[in-house]
Amino acid sequence: MDKKEIAQGLSPFVMMAFVDAQNLETGFLTRHRINKLTKEQIMGFSMETEKIINKLSHQLEQVADGNIPTDHECGTIFQYVFDKVTEALYKLLMGDEVDTQFNLKEAFDYHEPDLPEYIQLKLTNVVGKIGLINMKILHYLDENNARTNDYDSWLPAYLMVAVIIAIQFAQEIDPDDDSEMQAYLDN
């Protein structure tokens, strides 16, 4: 599969994140955007994020020494990208300075998004679903012999799925709703 075919093949995995009868295990997005971005804003943010994703891919390729990343390594990076994009977009939507940095080493160390705790809890509550989507994508890539040591052919498209899901997720976050945190504290 070439780069374009891989990207096209991965696009349906974004839909797994939406609540739907077909996505009982993976759905968490409702399409109810509290903080809407214009298409132009989304495109601009996506293009900037794509540059960052390409840099991360090249960094990983350099340190991997020709080895294909394991499921665990891929999942860690996928979740990291989801968290960091959510963080950056949340800050943008709240009118805060977007000072979010993407650092490959940080993905494998403990990192805590620079977000209020109740927003971090919203992220924590979808980790399992993000993990399932990630595993389904990796299965698809492996089934099609697309996960190779030619990182440029598959890794950016794979990570862009996390980016697209995070863009929708960040727009659905209600900054005034801390009910998940209250429920957590009550238990």
Please tell me what each predicted stretch does.
Residues 1-39:
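Leu/Val/Ala/Ile-rich N-terminal alpha-helices, chiefly Sec-type signal peptides and the beginnings
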Residues 157-166, 175:
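Alpha-helical oligomerization segments
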Residues 23-26, 30, 44, 51-154, ...:
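Long, low-complexity or tandemly repetitive, helically biased scaffold regions used
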Residues 2, 37, 41-44, 48, ...:
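Conserved aromatic-histidine-acidic binding/catalytic patches
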Residues 3-5, 41, 73, 119, ...:
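Single-residue recognition of alpha-helix capping/boundary positions
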Residues 183-187:
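Short acidic DE-rich linear segments
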